Amino acid sequence: EENETITPDTNTGSYYSYTQDKLFALLSDTSSTVLLSASLQDEISDVGKRGCIVGNDGNWDYLYSEKTGLNTLGLGWVHSYMYGAYAVMLYIPDPETGTVKTAIFKWLDAGWQKINMVKAHHIRGGIERFAASMKSVLESPDLPEVSEIVDKHEELLQKDEGELRQLVAPYLESIGTGKDAKSCPSHFITSVTSGEYLQQMDSDEIIRILLLEYIKTHIGDRAPETAADRVPVNTLGQQSS
C-alpha cells in the first residue's frame, strides 16, 4: 500500500490524495521477461484541492493549496473526488533494439456528486503527460545512479526543518518572482512571495522538491509543453468508467 498525491490536473488545476495498493510482477518466457505493474485505489480520495502548474508543465514546477474546489471559472465551489482509479502497465523489452515498449491500461472514475466527469481524452492526456516525463527521465544519459539518489535522500532526511527551509527558499523565490508566476492565480503567488507558503510546508514536501530539483539538474531537457508532440499513445487502453 502507498500514499499517492497527484500533481495538479492540467484541465482543472485540482489535485487529489489517496491510498492505493500496488503490485509488481515479472512475467517470463523463453524469449524475454516482461515487468507488470498494477495499481488499485483503496477508497475514495480526499476532497480535491486547488493547485497550480507553474508555467510549462514540462518544468515540473507545481504549487499546492488547502483550498477546496477547482480553478475552472465558476467551479470553485465544487467538492470533487477520485472515486476509483485502476491501472495496468506492461514494460516489454526488445532485445534486438535495446528498447522497452510500454503498454498502459487506465480506468478512472472522478467528478462530483458521484457523477463520473472523466472522458477518454482526459485519460489520454494523463497518459501522454506521464509517458513524456518517464521517457525524459529514463532515457537521459546523465540520470544519477539509484545509489546516488538514495544517498541524496538520506542526506536530506538528516537535516532539520530549519535547514530544509533555507535550502528550498531560493527555489520558491524564483517561482514567485519568475516570468511564469502569472500562470497561477494571484493568491498562490502572494502566498509564495510573502513567505506564508514556505512556513506551511512540512519536511516531506520540502524534501520532495529538493530531490526533484536534484534530479532535474542532472537530466537537463525534459518533457515538451505538449507531451503528445513526443510520445505517441494508442487509445486502446483508455476507459473512463
Regions found by a protein language model. Name each.
Residues 1-241:
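Terminal "cap-and-tail" regions of soluble proteins that handle hydrophobic small molecules
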